[in-house]
Amino acid sequence: MRTKLKLLAPALLLALTACNSTKPEPTANLGSGQTQMVKQFKSQKTQTFKINYLLFLPQDYDAKSEKRWPLILFLHGAGERGTNIWKVATHGPPKNVQEHPDFPFIVVSPQCPDGEHWSNEILLALLEQTVRDYTVDTNRIYLTGLSMGGFGTWDLGLTYPEKFAAIVPICGGGQMITVVLSSREKTQTLKTLGVWAFHGAKDPVVPLEESQRMVDGLKKVGVKDVKFTIYPDAGHNSWTEAYNDPQLYEWLLKHERK
C-alpha cells in the first residue's frame, strides 16, 4: 500500500515510510538512535517475575537536555510471546524504528512470556520505571497493541485512562467496557482520552464486533474523541496498514493528557 506522506515534517516522513516485512536480525546494544536496546525489568512487588523489553530512544535524545519526549507503549500479539526478544520487532512501532532512527517517540516494547497474557500491574510498573529513568513527556504517553495486545490495550487503557493521552487498540476487544458503562467516575476520566480503534472486516480470529462493541460503549457514555477505522478487505492483519499510516502518528502527537 502506498501512503500519502506530504503532510508530514521531513523527519517524521522518513520515520513512517512503510517498512518491508523482513524480520530484524539480532543487533548489539549500540545506544540511542542506532538500534533498540534489550532491557530487563524486574517488578519490585514480584521479584521472581522478570520481563524483557525493547527500548528505543530517538536519534536526538539527550538525557541532559530539558526536552521531554512522547512515549509509545506497544503490546504485541500472542505470536510474539516467548524468550526471543526480537520477535517483538516483527510488527508495529518496534519494527519501524529498527529501520528509522529518526522516529520521534520513545518506544517501549515488552515481551509477554509464553503462555501468559498482559498484566496491567507489570505494564504500569514498567511504564513508571521508564518515566523515572528517561526524559518522558508524561502528558504525551500513548498505548497501542495488536490482537492479544489490542485486548491488552483496551484493558489497560480503560482501567487507567488517566495514565494515557490516547490509546490505539488494533483487532482487539474485551470486557472492560462493562465496567465503564457502570462507573460514573470512570466515564468522567475517559472523556479526556483519545481513542482510535482499527479492525479488519474479514477478521476470522477476532470478530469485528469485538471492536465495534467497545467503540459503541464509549460513545454511549459520552466519550467524544473516538475514531474507528474498518478495513473492508482486511482479515486479522489490520495492523500493518494501521501502523504504516503516517496520519496515525500525527493524530497521536495532537493528543496531550489533560
Language model regions located:
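C-terminal catalytic histidine-bearing segment of alpha/beta-hydrolase fold enzymes
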Residues: 198, 204-258
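Active-site machinery of serine-nucleophile hydrolases
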Residues: 71, 75-121
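Bacterial N-terminal signal peptides that target proteins for export
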Residues: 1-8
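A domain-start/cap signature at the N-terminus of enzymes
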Residues: 19-71, 156, 181, 212-216, ...
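Primarily recognizes the serine-hydrolase "nucleophile elbow" in alpha/beta-hydrolase
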Residues: 139-188
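Short, proline-enriched alpha-helix->beta-strand connector loops that line the catalytic pocket
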Residues: 189-195
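Gly/Ser-rich "nucleophile elbow"/oxyanion-hole loop immediately N-terminal to the catalytic nucleophile
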Residues: 60-67, 115-148, 161
